[in-house]
């Protein structure tokens, strides 16, 4: 039996495909390549010595989904596909709702028709909005989202919650993760944003390699220890392992299951700059600029439920995150376009 990974050519998706192939799973990838590259899957093959079957296309394409379910014996879906930039979502809300919400609805409907009942959803800490309690536990209030990206994730969570109640065959696992960083230690796959990066670590590493002149630090007047935003940064390989653990724990385990995937530690933007400089012996030029719309001051997790129920704990620390980020960037200065 195979696992369908939507968005499997993307940053988190490709790292998860590596973990699945490494434990002998058969993997089918669907990706429209709007913010990813097919080269990532070639690199996955280099790392694992195994190949994922690839379909280029969109989760909104019912006919293609029907073809995939007909041609492959799929028993589980891990759903990464979607648009993911907070700032862009404020400018393009309808695109985000169409891709992230309508796309997931189509996928769930076609899974049901095909009799595929195991679903792992790539959600986000943004569903917590501006959190009232830190660290954030899974039972903290959701829905007070501050941008359309977060709202789209929250809406999908509600759809999954209602679907799990209405259709008892479904095993729905929601993984709310915090800020993925780093890259595979081989340096073969990593985060490869189009244009100016929206995420911090690619931005820092592109300054380090000389691709960008300096880092823009969005907001220096937050109520944090140094005025810059505090986040829970998690190594992408730890995150990928979390998906595998969730799949193994809840395969054919009907109902709704929700977990935070994070380290439980918060670091500011300037903490991250200093950590990168220290780990890689490089100076990063930066400037303090205005806050970015939709951003909040502080967000980090309590990941103890995942430890208790999934046996999952983030193992890779800040230094490893920085070293692996730089190893990927210096070996691939233009990302997958090299």
From Swiss-Prot:
Pfam families tied to this protein: Epimerase (PF01370)
Cofactor(s) listed in the protein's UniProt record: NAD(+)
Active site, UniProt feature: 149
Gene3D superfamilies: NAD(P)-binding Rossmann-like Domain, UDP-galactose 4-epimerase, domain 1
Catalyses which reaction(s): UDP-alpha-D-glucose = UDP-alpha-D-galactose
GO cellular component: cytosol
Keyword vocabulary terms for this entry: Carbohydrate metabolism, Galactose metabolism, Isomerase, NAD
Protein name in UniProt: UDP-glucose 4-epimerase
Protein's organism: Haemophilus influenzae (strain ATCC 51907 / DSM 11121 / KW20 / Rd)
Gene that produces this protein: galE
């Amino acid at each position: 039996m195979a696992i369908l990974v939507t968005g499997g050519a993307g940053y988190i998706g490709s790292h998860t495909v590596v973990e699945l192939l490494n434990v002998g799973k058969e993997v089918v990838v669907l990706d429209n390549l709007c913010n990813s590259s097919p080269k990532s899957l070639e690199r996955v093959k280099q790392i694992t010595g195994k190949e994922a079957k690839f379909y280029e296309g969109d989760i909104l394409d019912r006919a293609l989904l029907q073809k995939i379910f007909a041609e492959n014996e799929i028993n589980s879906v891990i759903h990464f596909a979607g648009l993911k930039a907070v700032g862009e979502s404020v400018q393009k809300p309808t695109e985000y709702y169409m891709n992230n919400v309508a796309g997931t609805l189509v996928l769930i409907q076609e899974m049901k028709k095909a009799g595929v009942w195991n679903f792992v959803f790539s959600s986000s800490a943004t569903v917590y909005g501006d959190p009232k309690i830190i660290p954030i536990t899974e039972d903290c209030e959701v829905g007070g989202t501050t941008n359309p990206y977060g709202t789209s994730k929250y809406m999908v969570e509600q759809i999954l919650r209602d679907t799990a109640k209405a259709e008892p065959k479904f095993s729905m696992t929601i993984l709310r993760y915090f800020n993925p960083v780093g890259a595979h230690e081989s340096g073969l796959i990593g985060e490869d944003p189009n244009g100016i990066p929206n995420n911090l670590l690619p931005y820092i590493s592109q300054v380090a390699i000389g691709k960008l002149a300096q880092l823009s630090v969005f907001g220096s007047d937050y109520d944090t220890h140094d005025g810059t935003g505090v986040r829970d940064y998690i190594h992408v390989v730890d995150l990928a392992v979390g998906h595998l653990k969730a799949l193994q724990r809840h395969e054919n385990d009907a109902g709704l299951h929700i977990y935070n995937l994070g380290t439980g530690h918060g670091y500011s933007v300037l903490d991250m700059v200093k950590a990168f400089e220290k780990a890689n012996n490089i100076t990063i030029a930066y400037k303090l600029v205005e806050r970015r719309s939709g951003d909040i001051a502080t967000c980090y997790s309590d990941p103890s439920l995942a430890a208790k129920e999934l046996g999952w704990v983030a193992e890779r620390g800040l230094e490893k995150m920085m070293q692996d980020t730089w190893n990927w960037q210096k070996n691939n200065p233009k990302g997958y376009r090299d």
